[in-house]
Amino acid sequence: MQAKTLHIRHLGNQDYETVWHAMQHYTDNRDENSPDELWLVEHPPVFTQGQAGKAEHILNPGDIPVIQVDRGGQVTYHGPGQLVAYPLLDIKRLKIGVRQLVTHIEQSIVDMLKPYGVQAYAKADAPGVYVDERKVASLGLRIRRGCSFHGLALNVDMDISPFQRINPCGYAGLEMVQCKALGGPNTVNEAGEKLTLTFSQLLGYEHLVHHQGLAE
């Protein structure tokens, strides 16, 4: 039954590095009985450069910090008004592979936007979720000891202009879009609530347990 319970952590607005180090700590110290968790958070403005990232894709960061991190993928931007969700899952226990997890994450975003009349889709060759060739959600995962961390960023109601300072996910000229402009969820809380439901349903979790803040 353990694998059928998902713990949701509502972290509010938290510094990127604090949450990143907490994810690493949780993943490094978990065992076969540790619960799966989904962390929901907003970050202050920051560019994060994944392991495949190339310096030339960071065009003009200006006063926004750039952090080199241990996830897959290239450079992306996080900022207020964006829902960031980190699934900390034992994928061995769930009996799914990395590609399946990526597909489930993308599909959970597609499914949550559908009731708003937003026709979103994933692309086989470019992880993330798109609407009319514009990117609404970015993805970057890390698997360690059969467990996932890092995750997804969904643009909800934010200033998307900092994306113009980079080649998002390594694609020059890739246009970003956000939920509010599409008629989707207007707030990070609303988006988090809807995403939690579609994500947990797709992965077969039967019970959700909610927590405020990081574990002590």
Curated annotation (Swiss-Prot):
Main location: cytoplasm
Top-level class of the enzyme under EC nomenclature: transferase
EC number(s) per entry: 2.3.1.181
Covalent S-S links between cysteines: none
Pathway given in the UniProt record: Protein modification; protein lipoylation via endogenous pathway; protein N(6)-(lipoyl)lysine from octanoyl-[acyl-carrier-protein]: step 1/2
Keyword Membrane tagged: no
Catalytic residues (UniProt): 169 (acyl-thioester intermediate)
Entry-linked CDD domains: LipB (cd16444)
Recorded catalytic activity of this chain's protein: octanoyl-[ACP] + L-lysyl-[protein] = N(6)-octanoyl-L-lysyl-[protein] + holo-[ACP] + H(+)
InterPro entries, per the entry: aa-tRNA-synth_II/BPL/LPL, BPL_LPL_catalytic, Octanoyltransferase, Octanoyltransferase_CS
Assigned keywords, A-Z: Acyltransferase, Cytoplasm, Transferase
GO MF term set: lipoyl(octanoyl) transferase activity
Locations listed in the record: Cytoplasm
Site (Lowers pKa of active site Cys): 135
Biological function: Catalyzes the transfer of endogenously produced octanoic acid from octanoyl-acyl-carrier-protein onto the lipoyl domains of lipoate-dependent enzymes. Lipoyl-ACP can also act as a substrate although octanoyl-ACP is likely to be the physiological substrate.
Additional remarks: In the reaction, the free carboxyl group of octanoic acid is attached via an amide linkage to the epsilon-amino group of a specific lysine residue of lipoyl domains of lipoate-dependent enzymes.
Family, similarity comment: Belongs to the LipB family.
Protein name: Octanoyltransferase
Organism whose genome encodes this protein: Shewanella amazonensis (strain ATCC BAA-1098 / SB2B)
Gene: lipB
